[in-house]
A protein has these predicted regions:
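Conserved structural motif at the start of ABC-family nucleotide-binding domains
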Residues: 3, 18-20
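Helix-to-loop junction immediately C-terminal to a conserved catalytic motif
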Residues: 49
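The feature captures the beta-strand-to-loop junction immediately N-terminal to the Walker
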Residues: 34-36
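Catalytic Walker B motif of ABC-type/P-loop ATPase nucleotide-binding domains
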Residues: 163-167
């Protein structure tokens, strides 16, 4: 299992956002979390990404990639996430090409000294996702759907072990929804 939670409770701003979570996710599984607003789906993503930490009690356990404590850099290399938190961290003056390139380096800003190999990877994924026409557009000028598909390309470029998408097809046109699914 790459993710194991036993009796996990999490609090955010003084409110319990996850109560007694018990969940195991195998490497080979595709998981879809469905639930009403406020049920803890996005909070679980924050736990996985180590943006919020659970309250560990006697019977509680949390392991990610088989480790109770994991180096954040290792985590960032192995997991790619697309959610509103990521969208809000992106420099709005970044062009889409540079946005996708930043995914290779785990950054949210312009990357200097990019290699030809890395540029080729960006061009390849943009072509595959049919967004080459967005290459020189600034992130702030994109539609919500264009932002989403560009962020998915950014997440995929480093070929992560785990891809986490929060509301992955929201704001996407039919063709893009089909590609993501």
């Amino acid at each position: 299992f790459w993710f194991e939670a036993k009796n996990i409770n999490c609090f955010k701003n003084g409110f319990r956002v996850i109560k007694d979570l018990n969940l195991k996710i195998a490497y080979s599984e595709n998981v879809i979390l469905i639930g009403p607003n406020g049920s803890g789906k996005s909070s679980l993503i924050e736990v996985i990404n180590r943006n919020i930490y659970p309250v560990i009690a006697n019977e509680s356990k949390l392991k990610i990639f088989g480790k109770e404590l994991i180096n954040l850099w290792e985590l960032r290399k192995r997991i790619s996430t697309v959610n509103n938190d990521i969208k809000n961290r992106i420099n709005p003056n970044l062009q889409v090409f540079d946005l996708i390139l930043s995914g290779l380096y785990g950054r949210y800003c312009y990357v200097q000294n990019k290699s030809e190999r890395d540029s080729y990877k960006v061009e390849k994924i943009m072509k595959k996702m049919n967004i080459s026409n967005l290459s020189k557009k600034y992130f702030s000028y994109l539609s919500d759907g264009e932002k989403k598909i560009s962020l998915i390309a950014r997440a995929l470029i480093k070929k992560p072990d785990i891809l986490i998408l929060d509301e992955p097809i929201a704001n996407l046109d039919y063709k893009s929804k089909f590609f993501v699914v």
